[in-house]
Amino acid sequence: MPEAIDASSIATNYYKLAHLCSVTYLIYTTNGATNDSTLLELELLIRHSHPKCLVTYYNKYLYYFQFNHVDEHVDLTKEYPQLQLKYSNQVSADLLANPPKVASDKDNHSTGNEYLAYACLSFLKAVKKLVLFNLSRNEAVQLFGNYAVVKEQGLSNFILHIDPILLPNGDLLISISEKCHLQLFDSSIVDISEIEAVDLNFVLYIIPSGIRCHLYDNVNVASNFTTDPPKNSEVLMQLIKYSTGFDLNQLNSLVWVKLVPNLQHLNNQTSKISKFIHPVDNKKFILWPWRLCLLQFGLSEKDTATSPHVLTCDPISLISDFIDFNISHHQQANITGQLNPNHQHNQSFNYSIPSALSTGMSSTGANENKGDLNMVGDIPGSVSDIFGIQSSDTNDFFNGPNFQPAQNPSDVKLDSQEPVKKNSDDEDVEMDDLFGDASEDEKAKTEVSTNELNEEKNFEDLFNDGLNQENQVDESDKVAKSIDEEVLKEESVKSEDLKEDKDLKMQPSSGTIPNTFIDIPKDQMTIPSLKNLKQTPQIYNDPGAPMPVIPTPIFPQFGINSTLPGSAQSVNPPTSAAATDNEANEGARSIFSPILFNPIIKSNIDTKYGKGGKFYVDKEVSAGPDIDSKRKTLRATSVSGFELPSRREDSIGIESITDDNDRRQVFEFPEEQGNERMKDEGHENHAAENDNIIKKMEELEEEDDNDDDDDDDDDDDENEDEDEESDEDDDLNLENNDMNMKRSPPLKLNTLNDPYVAQSNQAVVNFNDSNYNAKQILPNSYNASSMNTGGFSSPASLGFSSSRTNVPPKNDSPFGLNNLAREDRNGTTSPTGDNSDQPTKRQEQSDSPMVVDMEVEKKSTSKEAENTPSGMTTPNSRGSISESSNCLPLILRGVNVASIPTSFILNNVIVSNKISTISTNFDMDVDDETEWSDYELCKNNEMTVKLNNLDEFLKCLGPNLIFDMGLNKLQNSLEMKLSNNERDDEEYDNIEGKAPSRQFENKLCDIFPFCYKVNLNEFTTEAYVNELKGETTTIQDELDNQLSFLDDITNEDILNPKTQLKKLNSIEWDAIYSDSSSNEDNSKKYQGMVHNVGQSSLVNTLEDGTIFPLANDKARVLKHNDTIINLNSIGIKFWKYLNFSPLNGPKNFQLLLISEHDHNMLHHNYNIEFLNSLVYNYKECCFGNISKINLQSSDSRPDMEGIDNGLLMVHKKDEDQVYGNMYKQVNRKLNALVEMIKSDLINKTNKFEFDRPLLLLFINFDKSVNSLLQISKLIRNFKLFLSHHQLPLVEVFAHIIPWSLIIKQSGSQRRLKYLSNFRLSKLSMNLYNQCPNERTIGKPVKDPTKHLFTQLVKEPPSNLNFKFMNNGSNGNGKTTFNDDIFLHLAYERSIDKNWFSAAWSDPLGVVVSTKSWNCSPNLQKTNNKNVHSLESISDEIWTISTALFKKLNDEIIKRTSGLGGKKFLVLTRINSIIPDDELIHWKRLSMKHKDVSLIVLSVNKSPKLLFSGPIGPSQQEDKSNYDPNTNRTSTNMDNSSSTNAANPTCGVGATSNAPDFFKTFGSNNPSPNNNAGSMSISPSNNVGINFHSPQQFLNAPGNFLLPQDFVSSTGGSTNINANPHSNASQYNPDEIIHDPTEELTAVIPKAPLPSFNSPTRLGMKIGYLIKETGVSTHEDTKQYLVYEINLLSCSNYWNLNAIMKILLNQYKKLITLNDILCVGEIDGSITDDRAEKDSNIIPEMTPPLNYTASGLIPWHIAAVTKSLDYLIHIDVEE
């Protein structure tokens, strides 16, 4: 094995700031009554005035710390007379680092020891605040939450974790690491001037607190921004300056944004990640600088929609066929029109609505494209591609000289209608069904014919004479041409208006435009890509309903004067009561149902049905001033194509109630001081009128609530759930305003005094103006995306949705900062939630630190106070903003950044909140909709699942998420869409954090000049542990003191190294007070001594096992089906070549391959080819045999298709861009399969083998994120079908394979990839592991887990313990574990507390299991069995663990014929320490079950790229090993004897070569001679080749049977050093294959370092797994991956060093199980995407960083991480 690492050369992520011997701490309070906010403000002032002052507020006191070696200190009582010294004490660094739990009575200072525990925590907080403030002050970072953000490149920012640590020896360290995945962007990435056109697919966080906020108005987004600062802006900016060191006054034009803080996130709680962008009911808002906002963008699906079938179509032939049909059809139509002139009419109602196929999707209405053939460019991509039409070319073509525009819309009127006589021809009837009636006035019809003839002429010009055979012109063509000349002559005057008509095409056009359509006949549209669509609108044919007035249109008809759906004009009623009947009827028209449904019976029946249904609205319109006259009138039972509110009042805005002048009133944010506020003389009357209207609305709403109780049961339930998840405070319930006036919530924000201001005339900033001072009045702007950061509708446009919102908000806003902005303020609320009485006058606020040295604020505030009205909300104050605001909570309350999800996707947000428009998936089939709801399949890309059968669904989804061979990568299907296309290129999915950049290190060293990076050896020596404790003095130390006279004779540093350690610990220095004269000299002297001590202690670290390599694991396999052999785990990669057999016997099953059949693709036989290859490989690997399922449908069910040769093919239709319809087909066929299985059982045809499990093998062609969810639903439904048909004997398991693994697609061709033996064998291994164990038919499965094809080998005992010798343990606890049973349990709960996932495994792989639960707090109230509480989950976990312990105990009894040892459950919490609500259940269960002992660990989900070291000459030379053309050995044989003598004990698996883990090996090179590590049956000196060990067989040369290859016993290694390129080394029979990616080094620091997840709490012990990477940050350094394992709790049964060493060795085995269980990537080390595309590219031998990192994650940790990373994006619906 390689040599041991040099710990003194490896730099860690710790930086040493100081070495202290003693610290003095002082505790201050204020004079008189303690005011928390005063102390908080004083802390900010002191830190701003003295940046190097260690001060912090904690537990109602102000703590101030002083270093005793520093002479100059700040006297706080002199500078701040408000402070009063309460207590001071000087303590040693050891005592400050580890304070006693209970104060000693013998201590003279026992009265002050009660503060020592607080002083310990306060000291770390003070150091952290000092470091962060100085970094922020120097613009190195920006404060964010409880940490900071650092800018790497461009506009992206990453979280920077900075945690201080005080060691018992006096070392003051800071741990610095950068979080990789959470990416935040500066607010400047969004252009505010174009904010209305931007999809707001992001969430907002404010600096410095990190609190999530929502935009107040998400419809009129621009209205949220203003350049006018709030009245408390000076105080706010001053507070921000004091807290962050950043002065906002230096910015010229500061933009303010109106935000609603997320109160849930303020309490460190995370919103539901599956719908992370959600609306909030909270109306409390703040004005915050836009400069101090960070944005987190959501991930959306990549645009993967392709049309491969276009390549197989001939567009020329399609156009030719179209022209032929067009000519023949219109020849007949023109003759018919001339022979029957009386059937034509001049005026006709707009019956014909263009279909989705002819017009494309457009939400702007249907009439805008009438008479304009340019709408051909709007054809959907599937049609336009088929016809070869490009939009730009189309416009140029139809704008030619021969093209004529449609008739002027003003010439067409709709005053009268005439009956329509349809053509008797069948084709015309079909066209009428498709496009509506084709009857037109004579002029319009002639014009259409003219345009079409011109179109045909242009096509003839394009294709020359290709159509002459069928282009025969008859007399009708001559007549048409004469009419064409007349029309051209008449229309020549209007040529200038053509451009204006075209410009209006994309706008809502008038309803008077003549009715035309693209005359593509239905017969000609039945091409393969269109004939199966169901979007053709049909006339409503209900025999029991009245006759329809007009055919049901497919699109709403909007005129020029109407607006888009969702706007105020489309929702609000008419403003004039004198509207004509015509207008009333227009407003009452429905876009779907033209039927008038007015029930006569209105009594003796339930109100719900008496009104005509849930969507009934009164038709009567009164002319009086009553508010009902202003309501929108809808037809009874009408269904709108757009989302309508559930209540009538929801659609009424204030602009529909007040007059026009009131509606034009402008709402502005408060301007700067000195500006005049806009006033209206009739404002009081206007407000009073509004109050009267509000009262009427309340009365109407109460009546409506009484009437609609039954109608809105479902809506009420949804509202209750939303209220439970809402961020709205309990005190926002304004119905009980009087009762709540005296209550103070934890946080109250500003509330808009008039939240119902008309949104049509919002005052916004003209951001295009450079001075940012001008304002402009913008009309309604509803084109902002509803997918935004807050609610999905404007709070100002919600109308009067509830009676409680009509009451004016409360006045007691706690944000008044000591009454600086308001004089009549009473009371305040501290950030901690405690209420304290405050003086009511400014004269009594002299003790406020914000008043000290703030003359500017005094003057400005006094001027404002004169002109500022009372804070009491009155009708006269509508439109203003309450100016007093307590900004301390938003500045000082740092949110834990762990509550921010690393990513969130937008699938559920887009689908659930998108306006319900008609799409191409529109289907009139009611049964089809019922089918969707029954099967619970998603139509689009949403990630939703029903609550029913959720547990069964998770059982189907879990294995496909975890055991996926690393192929299902979520991030590959997602992308972050930014406005400037900025995104971090480095994406490391398997790396959680990394060391800070070199640029940041340079800034840190500039700010703290004497700090330095700590090397690893400083944590692994005894020099820094317990050196200052007096009780460590021994007899030897006393003897050394007596012999002190020898110092004059000899060098004591050489004779006694402890004297050097004492000198080292006596040196005090710090990097904080750099001005001190002694710091520079002491720091240099200290660092020099540290280097010397580290070099001398390197040998000690190797001897005591602090740093040791981990041995390669061995696996147990069967050879010749009867002999169990042990081999290195790398031999599993050559399973088929070595002819191994599974340890637990063969598993047989039957298979059904489910794949798609695309008739546009060539080479369809790849499915059967792959199936045959898999069946053959599975058999060749001795795993068993696979039978292909063959079932035929019975004669009584001809509708069911049989299954032949194990293939179930689903035909993909051309229009199936989304795979929803395909999943529906699979679901139907799986249901039919169950029926065929039951028929086979009844008929006893015995074609289905009930003694074999059934494998459903899916080839997944869907690239969307929800494809795994959809297929898991299919698997669940199949199991439900089996249960429904009472077929419990059928065992089912499923596996999903991405199509990219086995299929290569190029254009329209697909072929089977070359599948290596390695890949096929891996897939066979995976299927074997997932296949259920063999069982007797009819008996339940007894095994709680499935058998694996192999298991790892348990290490032999290092010594034999005999009971009579009693040497099994020492004084420090047990050190051996051979008889004990370890079961590892890893679990994690999502940060939104909705999902829970766990995985079990023993270190050898005997038992493995995984499971997930839904634990949503909101869904638990439904009492559904599929939702679990934390208590029930804990009980189930313990039950499963008990069953697994029993199986492990049975295995030990089977192997050793003896009883097992003690049971240890290694409880591992991922990404956090165990929270209190979880800890209480584990304590309860551990006390109940005494036979199981808990070992509690805390780990991270992935390693961090933290350590680095230099690249020496030897390492640089090792790079040649990566050259595939060389074949040299990786080590130097000359050093074998010397290094072995220097390192006699290297732990388990020690070899003759000293271990150096970080030397690189080529994967094709053999390892050095290793007699100790070879098999015991292999002789060390063997003449020739010996095949007793498979390891030797793997290294045998290909021509080993030739005579010249048999060499002497010394020929294997004699000439290696003489010629490094010699091939003589390959003849050594004892050489083994070695995989360098499996090499790990374990480090157990002796220093008590804290865990990353709990930086302020020391664990019992910490350990590291270290692995070298091929990535280097600089030319002279290389990087190391670090995986941290923190021991939180265990019994005193163990010695801490021994148990940590055991756990590190077991984690190495759990990492090896990654490959056996197919959890990690199967070929990440050898695959290069570029090499696959270009055969000339040689793949790099250095493995990718993601693959290297995955080799450092235990499989049970990776399983939990994979599960939760997907489950958190799934929304569970009731």
Curated annotation (Swiss-Prot):
Chief place of localization: nucleus
Residue spans of biased composition, Basic and acidic residues class: 412-424, 491-505, 674-698, 855-866
Gene Ontology CC: mediator complex
Keywords, ordered alphabetically: Activator, Coiled coil, Nucleus, Repressor, Transcription, Transcription regulation
Pfam families, sorted: Med13_C (PF06333), Med13_N (PF11597), MID_MedPIWI (PF18296)
Chain segments annotated as coiled-coil in the UniProt record: 437-506
Assembly, per entry: Component of the SRB8-11 complex, which itself associates with the Mediator complex.
Name of the protein in question: Mediator of RNA polymerase II transcription subunit 13
